[in-house]
């Protein structure tokens, strides 16, 4: 590592699925001499792209995990995170953006700005990541870079500026015109590695001149010297324009747009120049941490290597070498053998082996300096943990983790599969905070939860392949709850005589609805009607009853229990007896308290082109959705609704066909609400059927 922070670029390559993002990364690695042969994502040679190192990724031709790699271009060091383009893997994109300083937004010259481009762009805005855009696939039929630039302006609100013009398009795409140097650039040689510069073709000269004037006019806002040169009519140097473009990009006020075809090896080297010229180095970006000892007051971090170390673990991987933790150092130096503190649990950790990653190969290093990305071994932690020098109680702002929206049961075929499956689930839940798992107490089935059907499909497939576990999956199910709607009294005696000492306990009091908490227990016993040592047993008995409601066996929520009287026996009373008495008392009062079923209501936000607004609202209304609001955003509109989760299964397929695949939606848990009577009756019937078949 050179350790000159000005020469470091931490970038991500983000895009819509199939925009050619992994192919672009592959070409970058080839031109920067990190690899010596190029392979295509779905190539005939069957090797697959370098960055897609997971077997499943190579087969499906999609990127699932964001592999981190580094390369050098000129005297700059570039760390690249290759991120997935599927909406189901957004946690990977979120994590990558948290640790990047800049990004390349890859767009397809034919498809333009697509639904996932909007999601990725929103994520970049959330983390304030400056970016340059690359319009890929200019060799494809229907390629139209000018239209993509317009869409960047209208659909994403970017001040997009064309930095290049294409020389020919579709099958005739030969090279580019650089609008700053006013030279035509062609890419010769077997892999496009030989650059040839010539004069701008006559036919393109008028357009190139007017586009260059537009460019200079737009970026002059960011440079006084450029504005002066324009006003005084003096010569405008290339350096002046570049500095102005860099300033505008860092402020996120402009997005420079480059064009090319990664597959045809055209336009990659100028894009690499743009990364080093216009995207920020770690010192250009302001990073802050939260001071946990001062009520999370923000603390500005510096890129100074003399300061105490602060680093963020942003990705965990269980590889052939054991657990690998990807880490970005924001301040100070993380050295081998150093002791740091994990802000989440306050535990001290000694740093072992440090490495620098290239897809799934590695090289050992002694230290990671501020601004750099590396990986380390043998560190027990979770994704998103902050490590800081002793005496610093700092945490990097927590990464936004969306709630899972879909769940299904997964059943192993035999004992061996069960052992392997639990190993797999243990690993995946640690690596991916949006993938969760729990045991259904009713059916004893393992339930997995995630961000969408593809997300869970991939994990089920990985359990089968990587862990050799034969598993089957069930249908998705909704997590209903129960609650009470009125106050009801209880006075219950538990008495059991079985030779020797028996069991005896009486509890009296009432239960009532509680709106802001799941459960509250209040002891109003006076005069020792129940001895103090048995009160915790009473509370435990009531708590246990809440796990499974007497009516439908769903978990019970929103109940306050008050005990104000009771009785005990000097010999026969015990913890066990009072737990049993509390359970009986709860059953007795529960049915008198008019119990009802609650269902999870989701906040559903749909982004759709305006022409489909009516159709989308109709779909939501059919699903018992309540439209909360709509927002007009030019060509598209955003519809927000509150919809029961039970009605949302299969919605992605329906909305795709209703909007020609142009709408996208997000869904997150909002609240539990009472189920309408007609639906409650259906649920009751289903539960009765299930109980009957189980019996």
Curated annotation (Swiss-Prot):
Protein family according to the UniProt entry: Belongs to the TRAFAC class translation factor GTPase superfamily. Classic translation factor GTPase family. EF-G/EF-2 subfamily.
PROSITE patterns in UniProt: G_TR_1, G_TR_2
An annotated GO cellular component: cytoplasm
Annotated Pfam families: EFG_C, EFG_III, EFG_IV, GTP_EFTU, GTP_EFTU_D2
Keywords, comma-separated and alphabetical: Cytoplasm, Elongation factor, GTP-binding, Nucleotide-binding, Protein biosynthesis
Location in the cell: Cytoplasm
Keyword Ribosomal protein carried by entry: no
Protein name: Elongation factor G 1
Top-level taxon: Bacteria
Chain sites annotated for binding GTP: 15-22, 82-86, 136-139
Domain tr-type G: 6-284
InterPro entries named among the record's database cross-references: EFG_II (IPR041095), EFG_III (IPR009022), EFG_III/V (IPR035647), EFG_IV (IPR047872), EFG_V (IPR035649), EFG_V-like (IPR000640), EFTu-like_2 (IPR004161), G_TR_CS (IPR031157)
Organism: Syntrophus aciditrophicus (strain SB)
SMART domains with a match to the protein in the record: EFG_C, EFG_IV
GO molecular function, one term: GTP binding
Function, in words: Catalyzes the GTP-dependent ribosomal translocation step during translation elongation. During this step, the ribosome changes from the pre-translocational (PRE) to the post-translocational (POST) state as the newly formed A-site-bound peptidyl-tRNA and P-site-bound deacylated tRNA move to the P and E sites, respectively. Catalyzes the coordinated movement of the two tRNA molecules, the mRNA and conformational changes in the ribosome.
Record-linked SUPFAM superfamilies: EF-G C-terminal domain-like, P-loop containing nucleoside triphosphate hydrolases, Ribosomal protein S5 domain 2-like, Translation proteins
């Amino acid at each position: 590592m050179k350790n000159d922070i000005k020469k470091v670029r931490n970038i991500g390559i983000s895009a819509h699925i199939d925009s050619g993002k992994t192919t672009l990364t592959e070409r970058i690695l080839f031109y920067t001499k990190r690899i010596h042969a190029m392979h295509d994502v779905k190539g005939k040679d069957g090797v697959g792209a370098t960055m897609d190192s997971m077997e499943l990724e190579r087969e499906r031709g999609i990127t699932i995990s964001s592999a981190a790699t580094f390369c050098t271009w000129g005297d700059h060091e570039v760390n690249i995170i290759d991120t997935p383009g599927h909406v189901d893997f957004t946690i990977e994109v979120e994590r990558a953006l948290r640790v990047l300083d800049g990004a390349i937004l890859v767009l397809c010259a034919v498809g333009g700005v697509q639904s996932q481009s909007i999601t990725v762009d929103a994520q970049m805005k959330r983390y304030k990541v400056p970016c340059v855009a690359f319009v890929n696939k200019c060799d494809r039929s229907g390629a139209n870079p000018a239209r993509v630039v317009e869409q960047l302006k209208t659909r994403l609100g970017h001040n997009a500026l064309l930095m290049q013009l294409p020389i020919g398009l579709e099958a005739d795409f030969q090279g580019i015109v650089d609008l700053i140097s006013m030279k035509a650039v062609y890419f010769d040689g077997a892999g496009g590695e030989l650059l040839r510069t010539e004069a701008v073709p006559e036919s393109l000269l008028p357009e190139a001149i007017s586009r260059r004037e537009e460019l200079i006019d737009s970026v002059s806002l960011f440079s006084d010297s450029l504005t002066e040169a324009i006003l005084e009519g003096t010569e405008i140097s290339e350096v002046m324009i570049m500095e102005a473009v860099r300033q505008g990009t860092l402020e996120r006020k402009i997005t420079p747009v480059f064009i090319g075809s990664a597959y045809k090896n055209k336009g990659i080297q100028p894009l690499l120049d743009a990364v080093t010229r216009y995207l920020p180095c770690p010192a250009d970006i302001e990073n802050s941490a939260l001071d946990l000892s001062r009520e999370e007051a923000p603390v500005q971090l510096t890129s100074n290597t003399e300061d105490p170390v602060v680093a963020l673990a942003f990705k965990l991987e269980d590889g052939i070498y054991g657990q690998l933790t990807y880490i970005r150092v924001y301040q100070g130096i993380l050295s081998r053998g150093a002791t740091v503190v994990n802000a989440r649990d306050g535990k001290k950790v000694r740093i072992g082996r440090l490495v620098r990653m290239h897809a799934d190969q590695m090289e050992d290093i002694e230290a990671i300096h501020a601004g750099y990305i590396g990986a380390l071994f043998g560190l027990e932690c979770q994704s998103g943990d902050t490590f800081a020098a002793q005496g610093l109680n700092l945490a990097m702002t927590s990464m936004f983790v969306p709630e899972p929206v879909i769940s299904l049961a997964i059943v192993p075929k035999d004992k061996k599969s069960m052992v392997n499956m639990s190993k797999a689930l243990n690993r995946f839940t640690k690596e991916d905070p949006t993938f969760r798992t729990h045991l259904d107490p009713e059916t004893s089935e393992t339930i997995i939860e995630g961000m969408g059907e593809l997300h869970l499909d991939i994990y089920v497939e990985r359990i089968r392949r990587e862990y050799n576990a034969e598993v089957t999956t069930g249908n998705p199910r909704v997590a209903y709850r129960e609650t009470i709607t009125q106050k009801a009294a209880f006075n219950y005696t538990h008495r059991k005589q079985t030779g020797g000492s028996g069991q005896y306990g009486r509890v009296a009091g009432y239960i009532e609805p509680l709106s802001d908490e799941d459960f509250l227990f209040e002891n109003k016993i006076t005069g020792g009607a129940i001895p103090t040592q048995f009160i915790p047993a009473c509370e435990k008995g009531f708590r246990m009853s809440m796990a499974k409601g007497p009516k439908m066996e769903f978990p019970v929520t929103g109940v306050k229990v008050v005990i104000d009287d009771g009785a005990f026996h000097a010999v026969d009373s015990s913890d066990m007896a009072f737990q049993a008495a509390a359970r009986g008392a709860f059953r007795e009062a529960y049915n008198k308290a008019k119990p009802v079923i609650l269902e999870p209501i989701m906040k559903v936000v749909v982004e759709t082109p305006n022409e489909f607004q009516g159709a989308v609202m109709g779909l939501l209304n059919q699903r018992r959705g309540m439209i909360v609001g709509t927002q007009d955003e030019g060509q598209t509109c955003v519809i927000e609704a509150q919809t029961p989760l039970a009605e949302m299964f299969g919605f992605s397929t329906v909305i795709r066909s209703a909007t020609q695949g142009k709408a996208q939606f997000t869904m997150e848990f909002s609240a539990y609400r009472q189920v309408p009577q007609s639906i409650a009756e259906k649920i009751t019937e289903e539960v009765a059927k299930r109980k009957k078949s189980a019996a």
